[in-house]
Amino acid sequence: MKAIQKVMGIIYAVSVMSLLIVSYASSAANVHETPTIKTIDRWVQEVSNWGRWGDADESGTLNLITPEKRVAAARLVTAGISVSLGHYAMTEKTVDNNSPYEHSMITLNLPGAENSRFDSIKVESHGSAHTHVDALCHQLKAGELYNGYSADVITDSGCAKLGIDNLKDGVFTRGILIDVPRLKGVPWLEPGVAIYPEDLEAWEKQASIRVGAGDVLLVRTGRWARRAAKGPWPMSERSS
């Protein structure tokens, strides 16, 4: 298998992956210190995209996926194989799945439509088990959402701004798989093991590829392989 698999098609970021913890390295021989709240606040300011695409923008860095980027991505297709990023529906309640997927079938016998079948599906998208995409209205910073939108746009009926409907046309771009366990020569990363910028850079070097603007990064941690071997993922403070 090639070191990098370019996944083409409708690509969604999969937040069910293990938390990607990115921290700057200290100057002391590859020693990483836990960042303080003050440091994180500084990073937020340094990488902020607020206002970059106008005060009314609701798409964030999806703006980097231009028509030209999509055309360039389409030209990379060779095998034409579709690869799903969705995880199977988990129906068992466990420590890493507090809200199991529920599916039920209903059979109705109506005149002229005997044995008609319908189904009902219930899924709580947020959590640590179900594949989902977090909208930009998911998190606030000091009472504000992305681009300075007020928290008032969020109500019990949904988000008037920054909702997931901004992705209604899908995400089509170049996908880059970064297989961190393979890089480190292990089957999976254990809970609490962080991924640092130098890990991503090492994968770029090993795979002879360079991440560019508008790319989607698919970072493999091996969480599901570990779960299959050792059971439910421990939802501790540093292993979400």
List each model region and its residues.
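Accessible peptide chain termini
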Residues: M1-K2, V47
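Bacterial N-terminal signal peptides that target proteins for export
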Residues: K2-V14
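Bacterial N-terminal signal peptides
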Residues: I11-S23
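Active-/binding-site microenvironments in catalytic and ligand-binding cores
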Residues: S26-S240
